[in-house]
Amino acid sequence: PEKLLKSLVENLRWGRIEIDLIEMHGPTLGAIDDRLMALELVKADLSRAVLFNLDGKVVIPADTFYRKRVLAMRGKFYAVEQGDIDLFMHAKSRFQKESKASDSEVLSLTELTMAQMANDKSIDTSDFLARANRLSDAGFHVLISGFFRHFRVSQYLSGNTREPVAIVT
Protein backbone atom coordinates (compact mmCIF):
# COMPACT_ATOMS: atom_id res chain seq x y z
CA PRO A 1 0.00 0.00 0.00
CA GLU A 2 2.73 2.49 0.85
CA LYS A 3 4.50 1.95 -2.48
CA LEU A 4 1.25 2.49 -4.36
CA LEU A 5 0.57 5.76 -2.55
CA LYS A 6 4.11 6.99 -3.14
CA SER A 7 3.71 6.29 -6.85
CA LEU A 8 0.52 8.39 -6.95
CA VAL A 9 2.38 11.50 -5.86
CA GLU A 10 5.66 10.91 -7.62
CA ASN A 11 7.11 14.19 -8.93
CA LEU A 12 4.42 16.29 -7.24
CA ARG A 13 5.21 18.90 -4.64
CA TRP A 14 3.64 18.51 -1.19
CA GLY A 15 0.20 20.09 -1.05
CA ARG A 16 -0.56 19.71 -4.75
CA ILE A 17 -2.91 16.78 -4.23
CA GLU A 18 -5.40 15.68 -1.60
CA ILE A 19 -7.22 12.36 -1.81
CA ASP A 20 -10.56 11.96 -0.02
CA LEU A 21 -11.24 8.31 -0.78
CA ILE A 22 -9.46 5.37 -2.31
CA GLU A 23 -11.13 2.10 -3.29
CA MET A 24 -9.45 -0.96 -4.71
CA HIS A 25 -11.33 -3.35 -6.99
CA GLY A 26 -10.09 -6.11 -9.24
CA PRO A 27 -8.74 -9.63 -9.18
CA THR A 28 -5.23 -8.67 -8.07
CA LEU A 29 -6.34 -5.97 -5.64
CA GLY A 30 -8.81 -8.00 -3.60
CA ALA A 31 -6.38 -8.56 -0.74
CA ILE A 32 -5.89 -4.82 -0.18
CA ASP A 33 -8.18 -3.44 2.53
CA ASP A 34 -9.69 -0.08 1.52
CA ARG A 35 -9.84 0.95 5.18
CA LEU A 36 -6.10 0.42 5.68
CA MET A 37 -5.40 2.29 2.45
CA ALA A 38 -7.48 5.21 3.76
CA LEU A 39 -5.43 5.29 6.96
CA GLU A 40 -2.25 5.22 4.89
CA LEU A 41 -3.53 8.37 3.12
CA VAL A 42 -3.63 10.24 6.42
CA LYS A 43 -0.30 8.78 7.52
CA ALA A 44 1.32 9.92 4.25
CA ASP A 45 -0.26 13.43 4.47
CA LEU A 46 -2.25 12.82 1.27
CA SER A 47 -5.51 13.38 3.13
CA ARG A 48 -6.29 15.56 6.12
CA ALA A 49 -8.82 13.04 7.41
CA VAL A 50 -10.75 9.89 6.52
CA LEU A 51 -14.23 8.98 7.67
CA PHE A 52 -15.66 5.57 8.54
CA ASN A 53 -19.45 5.20 8.62
CA LEU A 54 -21.47 3.11 11.09
CA ASP A 55 -20.77 -0.01 9.01
CA GLY A 56 -17.02 0.64 9.21
CA LYS A 57 -16.74 1.53 5.51
CA VAL A 58 -14.72 4.47 4.23
CA VAL A 59 -16.96 7.28 2.96
CA ILE A 60 -16.46 10.79 1.61
CA PRO A 61 -16.74 13.23 4.54
CA ALA A 62 -18.40 16.06 2.58
CA ASP A 63 -21.20 13.74 1.44
CA THR A 64 -21.79 12.40 4.94
CA PHE A 65 -21.69 15.80 6.68
CA TYR A 66 -23.97 17.51 4.14
CA ARG A 67 -26.90 19.21 5.93
CA LYS A 68 -26.01 17.59 9.25
CA ARG A 69 -25.21 19.13 12.58
CA VAL A 70 -21.97 17.49 13.69
CA LEU A 71 -21.13 16.59 17.27
CA ALA A 72 -17.61 15.24 17.58
CA MET A 73 -15.73 13.79 20.53
CA ARG A 74 -11.93 13.71 20.41
CA GLY A 75 -9.97 11.04 22.17
CA LYS A 76 -7.56 8.14 21.91
CA PHE A 77 -10.28 5.51 22.46
CA TYR A 78 -8.00 2.59 23.24
CA ALA A 79 -11.15 1.19 24.82
CA VAL A 80 -14.76 2.27 24.38
CA GLU A 81 -15.86 2.96 27.94
CA GLN A 82 -19.39 3.51 29.18
CA GLY A 83 -18.35 6.78 30.82
CA ASP A 84 -17.30 8.17 27.43
CA ILE A 85 -20.58 7.08 25.85
CA ASP A 86 -22.60 8.63 28.70
CA LEU A 87 -20.68 11.90 28.39
CA PHE A 88 -21.25 11.95 24.66
CA MET A 89 -24.98 11.18 24.97
CA HIS A 90 -25.40 13.99 27.51
CA ALA A 91 -23.58 16.38 25.18
CA LYS A 92 -25.69 15.19 22.25
CA SER A 93 -29.00 15.82 24.03
CA ARG A 94 -27.80 19.29 25.04
CA PHE A 95 -26.55 20.00 21.49
CA GLN A 96 -29.91 18.90 20.06
CA LYS A 97 -31.79 21.10 22.49
CA GLU A 98 -29.63 24.17 21.84
CA SER A 99 -29.64 23.77 18.05
CA LYS A 100 -33.30 22.65 17.93
CA ALA A 101 -32.37 19.50 16.01
CA SER A 102 -33.91 16.07 15.80
CA ASP A 103 -31.85 12.94 16.36
CA SER A 104 -31.60 12.30 12.61
CA GLU A 105 -30.19 15.78 12.00
CA VAL A 106 -27.19 15.24 14.30
CA LEU A 107 -24.23 13.17 13.17
CA SER A 108 -22.43 11.53 16.11
CA LEU A 109 -18.73 11.39 15.43
CA THR A 110 -15.59 10.33 17.25
CA GLU A 111 -12.23 11.69 16.15
CA LEU A 112 -8.84 10.04 16.52
CA THR A 113 -5.69 11.86 15.53
CA MET A 114 -2.47 10.50 14.10
CA ALA A 115 -0.80 13.89 14.63
CA GLN A 116 0.59 13.03 18.06
CA MET A 117 2.61 10.32 16.38
CA ALA A 118 3.81 12.53 13.53
CA ASN A 119 7.46 12.18 14.51
CA ASP A 120 7.08 8.42 14.83
CA LYS A 121 7.33 6.95 11.34
CA SER A 122 6.08 3.59 12.58
CA ILE A 123 2.40 4.50 13.07
CA ASP A 124 0.46 1.28 13.45
CA THR A 125 -2.49 1.69 11.09
CA SER A 126 -3.92 -1.68 12.13
CA ASP A 127 -4.25 -0.35 15.71
CA PHE A 128 -6.18 2.68 14.44
CA LEU A 129 -8.36 0.39 12.34
CA ALA A 130 -9.14 -1.79 15.37
CA ARG A 131 -10.15 1.29 17.37
CA ALA A 132 -12.28 2.54 14.48
CA ASN A 133 -14.04 -0.83 14.32
CA ARG A 134 -14.82 -0.71 18.06
CA LEU A 135 -16.21 2.81 17.77
CA SER A 136 -18.30 1.95 14.71
CA ASP A 137 -19.70 -1.04 16.58
CA ALA A 138 -20.64 1.33 19.42
CA GLY A 139 -22.70 3.44 16.98
CA PHE A 140 -20.33 6.25 16.02
CA HIS A 141 -18.98 7.55 12.75
CA VAL A 142 -15.18 7.68 13.08
CA LEU A 143 -12.94 10.42 11.73
CA ILE A 144 -9.22 9.67 11.74
CA SER A 145 -7.23 12.80 11.08
CA GLY A 146 -3.84 14.37 11.07
CA PHE A 147 -5.05 17.36 13.13
CA PHE A 148 -3.07 18.15 16.25
CA ARG A 149 -5.23 21.03 17.54
CA HIS A 150 -8.95 21.17 18.31
CA PHE A 151 -9.61 24.27 16.21
CA ARG A 152 -8.29 22.47 13.10
CA VAL A 153 -10.87 19.73 13.60
CA SER A 154 -13.55 22.39 14.00
CA GLN A 155 -12.39 24.18 10.84
CA TYR A 156 -12.39 20.92 8.88
CA LEU A 157 -15.89 19.95 10.03
CA SER A 158 -17.25 23.47 9.45
CA GLY A 159 -15.80 23.39 5.94
CA ASN A 160 -17.91 20.32 5.16
CA THR A 161 -21.27 21.46 6.58
CA ARG A 162 -23.10 24.75 6.99
CA GLU A 163 -24.87 23.46 10.08
CA PRO A 164 -23.56 23.91 13.65
CA VAL A 165 -20.53 21.92 14.80
CA ALA A 166 -19.59 21.12 18.39
CA ILE A 167 -16.65 19.24 19.91
CA VAL A 168 -16.76 17.31 23.18
CA THR A 169 -13.47 16.93 25.04
Spans of model-derived segments:
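Nucleotidyltransferase catalytic core that binds NTPs
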Residues: P1-T169
